[in-house]
Amino acid sequence: MGGLSIWHWLIVLLIVALVFGTKKLRNIGNDLGSAVKGFKDGMKEGEAPADAQQLPRSGSVDVNAKETTRSDSNKA
């Protein structure tokens, strides 16, 4: 009894359609769809400059570098 069945949802949908009208609901659907599309486009635009702005690596790595510890530096 705690869950809503398909009949409950159909009755709620019918009441919403009667209160707002199908034209108003269609406009809300179009507005929501365009908002989602705009959000996705904005996310794509935000990703492109981040990839282009990667800084080139500079410097070199010494492959013969020796790892020193604190006790090694105290001995010298």
From Swiss-Prot:
Residues annotated as transmembrane: 1-21
Xref: InterPro entries: TatA/B/E, TatA/E
Main localization category: membrane
GO cellular component assignments: TAT protein transport complex
Record's subcellular location: Cell inner membrane
Bilayer topology term: Single-pass membrane protein
Ranges of compositional bias, category Basic and acidic residues: 64-76
Alphabetical keyword list: Cell inner membrane, Cell membrane, Membrane, Protein transport, Translocation, Transmembrane, Transmembrane helix, Transport
GO biological process: protein transport by the Tat complex
Domain of life (superkingdom): Bacteria
Record Pfam families: TatA_B_E
GO molecular function, one term: protein transmembrane transporter activity
Region of interest: Disordered: 43-76
Record function comment: Part of the twin-arginine translocation (Tat) system that transports large folded proteins containing a characteristic twin-arginine motif in their signal peptide across membranes. TatA could form the protein-conducting channel of the Tat system.
Family: Belongs to the TatA/E family.
Quaternary structure (record): The Tat system comprises two distinct complexes: a TatABC complex, containing multiple copies of TatA, TatB and TatC subunits, and a separate TatA complex, containing only TatA subunits. Substrates initially bind to the TatABC complex, which probably triggers association of the separate TatA complex to form the active translocon.
NCBIfam families: PRK02958.1, tatAE
Protein name, entry field: Sec-independent protein translocase protein TatA
Organism field: Burkholderia lata (strain ATCC 17760 / DSM 23089 / LMG 22485 / NCIMB 9086 / R18194 / 383)
Gene transcribed to yield this protein: tatA
